[in-house]
Amino acid sequence: MFVQKSIDLGHGRILSIETGKMAKQADGAAIVRLGDTMVLATVVSSKKTPPLGQDFFPLQVEYREKYSAAGRFPGGFFKREGRPSEKEILSARLIDRALRPLFPDGYYYETQIIISVISSDQVNDGDVLGGLAASAAIMVSDIPFQNPMSEVRVGRVNGLYIINPDVNELKESDIDMCIGGTNDTICMLEGEMNEISETEMLEAIQFGHTAIRKLCVLQQEVAAEVAKPKRLFVPTVIPTELDSFVRANCQSRLRELAYTPLGKEERAERTAAIYNETLAATLEHFRATISSEEAQADTAKALCLNEHIIEDQIHAVEKEVMRHMILDDAKRLDGRALDQVRPITIELGLIPRAHGSALFTRGETQALVTLTLGTQKDAQSVDNLTNSDDKRFYLHYNFPPFSVGECGRLGSIGRREIGHGNLAERSIKMVAPTEAEFPYTIRIVSDILESNGSSSMASVCGGTLALMDGGVPIRKPVSGIAMGLIKENDKYAVLSDILGNEDHLGDMDFKVSGTRDGITACQMDIKIDGLDYHIVENALEQARKGRLHILNEMEKAIPASRTDLATYAPRLTTIKIPSDCIGMVIGKGGETIRGITEETGAEINIADDGTVTIACTTKEGTDAALATIKSLTAKPEVGNIYVGKVRDVRDELGAFVEFLPKTDGLVHISEISSTRVAKVSDHLKVGDKVTVKLVDVRKDPRTGKTKFALSIKALEQPKQEGGEATQN
C-alpha cells in the first residue's frame, strides 16, 4: 500500500514521507525527501527468539551515502564505495542514540536498520532525514516501538532560527545542533555553537522540539494508513521469589558499599565479590528447591536458575540503591556533593619532541594530549555529498583497553572513539585561529590513560591546554564537563562531573563545553521519557558553574598561550611569486622543488595563486630555501649584480654564464678584464663561479630571443692616480 504525506518546514521547505513503493520485503521501509535529497530507510528485526538470559539489544544502525546519489563517481581504483566514512559513522551514531531508548525494555531481538542516501542535491544533508526515515520505517513495520521519533537540525542565521538549514545557511549560522525527540520529550542532542548562552541553547531546543512534534504526527498519520498490526512481544517477568531472595542477600551489603567513598578499582573488586557470593547463594538455594524437570516445564522456575537473569537482578538492586542514595541523601559514590567537580591536576610540556602537550587528570580520568603543527599538505581531506574540503584543524581520540584495566584487541578505530573525538574537536575548533592568523595545520591527539567517566571532556580540557602550551593563539580557553541525572517520578538530582557508574546507572549523559562567554558544543543522551525543560535548564546552569570552575584551574596552570612556538615546531614563512613562475620553482617532474627540500631540509608548498609556504625547524634552512626560490623567480634587471656559474667558454668570443636559474648571459671577451684578454680559457673555465653585472638587455631582431650582456670588468674598482684601488 503506497502512502505519501508531506509537511511545510517553513521558508518553503517541503518535507515528505512515503512508504509502500520500495523495499517491500523488509519489515518496514520509508523514504524521506527534502528538496532533491531522498533517504531510504529499511528495518528488519529477527523473529528468532533470543537466547534465555541475553541482556543486551543487538541493534545495528548503518548510514550510507552513495556517490551515485549526486551523479558522482567514488574515488579509488575500484570506483566503488568502501568502508563507511567518518561522517557516515557519526550520522549512524546520531540515529542509533535517538532510537535505541524507544524500543521496549527487554526487547532483545536482533534488529538492523539501514539508511541509504539515494539522491542528493548536495545542499540538504541526509543525516537528520535518515533519523526521521528510520523511525518512519519502524512505525510502518510490525516491530514493537513506543513512540515515533523525529530528528531535525536547528540553525540560526541573523538571529532567526531555521529547521534543517541547508549547507549554505549553515556557513552563516552560529548554531548547528541536531535534536532527536518524541512528541513528549527530547532524547538526543548534539551540536556546535559559537559561544551561545544557556538561555539561547534552551530556546533552540524548544524551537526544534516544536518541529519534531509536527513530524511525529506526520509519521503517525502514515502509520495509521498502513495499519500494520504489531507483532506480539511479552517481556520477561522476573519471578517474585527470585527478586526477594536476591534482595535479601545483597541489598544491605550494596547499600553499605555505596555509602563508603572508594576508588574505582577497590569499589569494583568489592562489588564483584558481592555479585559472586549472591550468585552462588541464589543458585545453591534454587537448585535445592527446583528440579531439572520443573525447570524444563516452567519458564519462571528456569529463570531462577539462569545466571544471567540472577546477575541482572543484582544489577537492578545495585542501581536502585545508588539512585536512592543520591535522591534521598544527596550523597554520591565517591562522597562528593551533587555539584562538586573532582580534583584536577595539570602538567604541561611533558613530551619533549611534541609541539605542545598536556597531562590533564580529573579524579580517576586522565588524558595525555599532544599537539602537532604542520603545513597545508598535512590537512585532512574531506569528501562527502555535501562537503569537499581540507580540514586544517582536527582532533583524534584514542581509548586503549588498559585505561579501564582490561585486556582488549587493538586495531581499527571504533565508532565510540570517532564520536568522542568529533565532539572534542567541535568543542575547541570554535576558538581556533583562522588560517590568516595562524597558517598551520593543527592536529591534536588525546590518549586516554585512565577512565572513570567524562574522558571526552578531559580531551577538551587537555586539547585546549596543549594548544596553549604549543603557542597556538586561540581566542579563549575551552573546558568541558559531563552532567548526569537521576529521576524518579517528580524527584530528580542533577550531577556534575559524573563517574562511570553514575553514567551507567543514571538517566542522562549531558556533555557541555564552552568558554567563559558561552557554549561551544554539547551532546546529550536521555534514557527516560518525560524530560522537563526546567531540568535541562537546571543542568545547563549547573554545567556553566562547573565549566567555569575547571577554567579557573586551567588558567592557574597557563593563563594564556605561550608567545613562542615549541623548539621542534616548524616555522612557516610565506612569500608570493608570479603564477607563471610556479613551474620554474617546481621543475620538471618536481625535480627543482625536491632538490631545494633535500638541500635545505625545508618543506615547500605552492598554492595555485603563487603563494609559497616554507616550513622548516631551523632558520638557516628557511633562509636557504627562501634565497633559492627568490633567485628562481627573480627577473633580470640592468645594473644588478649576480653570482653565476660558467656554462660554456668560447676563446675568441667570451663566456656564457648562468646568472639566474635557466637564464644565461654572455660575458664578452672585452668585458672579462680591464687588461687585454687574448684567450678566454686562460681566465675562465666551465664550472667556475663568477660575480657579474648585467649591463644590457636586448632582443635579437632575427630570432626574437632576449639576450643578456654581462660584465666582470664593470665590477673592477677604479684605480686612483697612485695606482691604489678605491676602498668603499
UniProtKB/Swiss-Prot annotation:
Q: What is its EC number?
A: 2.7.7.8
Q: Which domain of life is it from?
A: Bacteria
Q: Which residues bind Mg(2+)?
A: D503, D509
Which InterPro entries does the protein's record reference?
ExoRNase_PH_dom1, ExoRNase_PH_dom2, ExoRNase_PH_dom2_sf, KH_dom, KH_dom_type_1, KH_dom_type_1_sf, NA-bd_OB-fold, PNPase
Location relative to the cell: Cytoplasm
Listed as disulfide-bonded, the cysteine pairs are: none
GO biological process terms on file: mRNA catabolic process; RNA processing
Q: Name one GO molecular function term.
A: magnesium ion binding
What PANTHER family would the database entry show?
POLYRIBONUCLEOTIDE NUCLEOTIDYLTRANSFERASE, POLYRIBONUCLEOTIDE NUCLEOTIDYLTRANSFERASE 1, MITOCHONDRIAL
Protein name (Swiss-Prot/TrEMBL): Polyribonucleotide nucleotidyltransferase
Say which species the protein is native to: Chlorobium chlorochromatii (strain CaD3)
- Corresponding gene? pnp
